[in-house]
A protein has these predicted regions:
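Glycine-rich beta->alpha junctions and the first turn(s) of the following alpha-helix
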Residues: 114-196
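Internal helix-loop-helix
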Residues: 1-37, 76-83
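Short glycine/proline-enriched turns and hinge-like loops at secondary-structure junctions
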Residues: 50-53, 64, 77-82, 96-100, ...
Length: 196
């Protein structure tokens, strides 16, 4: 109801800070108005799940376009998203593990080459978490978000506040569940007596 659920809320802040005016008009405005939805595609099944400097998804320059190939997973909200913010390695001359090797792209969805192969099962099912295989997906230079080589910085900017928001949300839900259990145990009669 407040349009502040992940992943859209974090993507709004990211677009506000990193997007061009044209990108803000096309992606941020509809997202803020609640008529669009998004996902953030950084996590990968190999080492880049815990270290985004080691992302294997890559982008190869081809004229004024990029050809993207790779594998992402636990991508929250991908099945309902109208666009994705995707992080890919583009600077092949930069040593692996360097912070300047990755670039962020805005991907219109659906797109040819973006394959949602399955939903990854988790305890939290509100937005769903997809496994995505990217095969020869073409994007224009104008779809770069935040400039070449800034994907790691953008990702950290995006995820820092999001991690805090997730923690607040889950702690509040756990506290509410505990309060409900205490209330129930103090007022529940079973076999002629209170549980507590």
């Amino acid at each position: 109801v407040f349009n502040c659920q992940a992943p859209d809320e974090g993507n709004m802040h990211t677009l506000l800070h990193w997007a061009t005016d044209e990108q803000k008009e096309k992606y941020l405005k509809p997202l803020v108005n609640g008529v669009s939805s998004s996902c953030f595609a950084m996590t990968e099944p190999e080492v880049a799940g815990s270290d985004p400097t080691l992302i294997r998804t890559n982008g190869i320059k081809d004229g004024d376009e990029w050809i993207l190939n790779g594998h992402k997973w636990f991508i929250s909200g991908a099945r309902r998203a109208k666009f994705a913010i995707l992080i890919a390695r583009t600077e092949m001359d930069v040593p692996e593990g360097s912070r300047g090797a990755n670039t962020a792209f805005i991907i219109d969805l659906p797109s040819q080459g973006w394959n949602d192969v399955r939903e990854v099962a988790t305890m939290h099912g509100a937005t769903g978490h997809s496994e995505i295989v990217i095969e020869d997906l073409r994007v224009h230079d104008s779809q770069i978000l935040g400039g070449r080589g800034n994907g790691h910085r953008l990702g950290q900017y995006r995820l820092g506040p999001a991690r805090l928001a997730h923690c607040m949300r889950w702690v509040a839900q756990a506290e509410t569940a505990l309060d409900m259990m205490v209330e129930r145990s103090l007022n529940r009669f079973s076999h002629g007596s209170l549980l507590a």
